[in-house]
């Protein structure tokens, strides 16, 4: 299953960009990053057999284990792509939230969207590591 991060804003050559790159290189699944301008630009149309996840502070906060179970369920259920949407500084509008299959939160705090991208990359690596029985994740 393709893990596709669709993010508003250019990450450039920042420490966050280095973190994103480091984690995405370690993931054994195919990955893709699409950057859109802060305003405007078109979110790529979700292909058939895909799931859309919007990162949103009002979404569901889950453990790394539950996040891995979600990925596993989508993969084993025939989803070919998981699109992770990261909004700009003002987040997503109501229509984007309504269209998403799942709203995911990294807790009640508000995170800078560039840091949220790095956090998502790490959680994707952690989740795929859990599913591969890799020792990276330590529960408890």
Tell me what each language-model feature is.
Residues 28-83, 91:
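S-adenosyl-L-methionine/SAH cofactor-binding core of RNA-modifying enzymes
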Residues 1-27:
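N-terminal beta1-alpha1 ligand-phosphate binding loop
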Residues 16-18, 64-68, 97, 117:
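Conserved strand-to-helix beginnings and helix N-cap segments that scaffold or border functional pockets
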Residues 87:
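Rossmann-fold NAD(P)-binding glycine/threonine-rich loop
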């Amino acid at each position: 299953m393709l893990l596709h991060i669709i993010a508003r804003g250019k990450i450039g050559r920042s420490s966050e960009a280095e973190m994103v790159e480091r984690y995405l290189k370690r993931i054994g699944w195919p990955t893709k990053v699409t950057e859109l301008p802060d305003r405007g630009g078109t979110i790529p149309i979700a292909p058939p057999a895909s799931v859309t996840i919007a990162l949103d502070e009002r979404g569901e906060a889950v453990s790394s284990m539950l996040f891995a179970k979600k990925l596993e369920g989508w993969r084993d259920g025939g989803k070919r792509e998981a699109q992770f949407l990261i909004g700009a500084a003002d987040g997503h509008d109501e229509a984007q939230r309504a269209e998403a299959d799942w709203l995911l939160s990294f807790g009640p705090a508000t995170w800078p969207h560039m840091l949220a991208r790095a956090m998502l990359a790490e959680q994707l690596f952690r989740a795929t590591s859990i599913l591969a029985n890799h020792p990276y994740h330590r529960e408890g």
